Amino acid sequence: MATKIDKEACRAAYNLVRDDGSAVIWVTFKYDGSTIVPGEQGAEYQHFIQQCTDDVRLFAFVRFTTGDAMSKRSKFALITWIGENVSGLQRAKTGTDKTLVKEVVQNFAKEFVISDRKELEEDFIKSELKKAGGANYDAQTE
């Protein structure tokens, strides 16, 4: 059966993360049968990492705050998590299903495909987002 996405529900969750006034900084999009629907959401990145278990595949939209003391800004990441115990067929299907998620999640600084929990570390993601942002204007120390 072809995968579908609940666009309205997923768009509402996506917009919640994009809203700077919202405490929600991440949302997952998971499979409910053959439909992609919003999953968990939260205000703590560590709670997101707990969703990424070896037997699950999911997509996540995450807001990170970057910059220095003078200039804070939000950067967004689209993360595809594929656990180690996910079957080969499901792994392959995740890649094509991501196009459905991208119909909703359109604005992000960098995309990640991760199956190793070490790559989910917040510092690693932030450093990759910083590289993707181009020039580094952090306050210089002399």
Curated annotation (Swiss-Prot):
It is found in: Cytoplasm; Cytoplasm, Cytoskeleton; Nucleus. Widely expressed with highest levels in placenta, lung, kidney and peripheral blood leukocytes and lower levels in brain, liver and pancreas. Coiled coil: none annotated. SUPFAM superfamilies: Actin depolymerizing proteins (SSF55753). The modification N-acetylalanine is found at A2. Belongs to the actin-binding proteins ADF family. Coactosin subfamily. Residues 66-75 are annotated as: Flexible and important for F-actin binding. Changing K130A: No effect on 5LO-binding activity. This is Coactosin-like protein. Keywords: Acetylation, Actin-binding, Chaperone, Cytoplasm, Cytoskeleton, Nucleus. One of its GO terms (molecular function) is enzyme binding. Gene3D superfamilies: Severin. Residues 2-130 form the ADF-H domain. Binds to F-actin in a calcium-independent manner. Has no direct effect on actin depolymerization. Acts as a chaperone for ALOX5 (5LO), influencing both its stability and activity in leukotrienes synthesis. Transmembrane segments: none annotated. PROSITE patterns: ADF_H. It comes from the Eukaryota. Interacts with 5-lipoxygenase (ALOX5/5LO) in a calcium-independent manner. Binds to F-actin with a stoichiometry of 1:2. It comes from Homo sapiens (Human). GO terms for cellular component: cortical actin cytoskeleton; cytosol; extracellular exosome; extracellular region; ficolin-1-rich granule lumen; nucleus; secretory granule lumen; site of polarized growth. The modification N6-acetyllysine is found at K102, K126. The lineage of its organism: Eukaryota, Metazoa, Chordata, Craniata, Vertebrata. Pfam families: Cofilin_ADF (PF00241). Signal peptide: none annotated. InterPro entries: ADF-H (IPR002108), ADF-H/Gelsolin-like_dom_sf (IPR029006). One of its GO terms (biological process) is defense response to fungus.
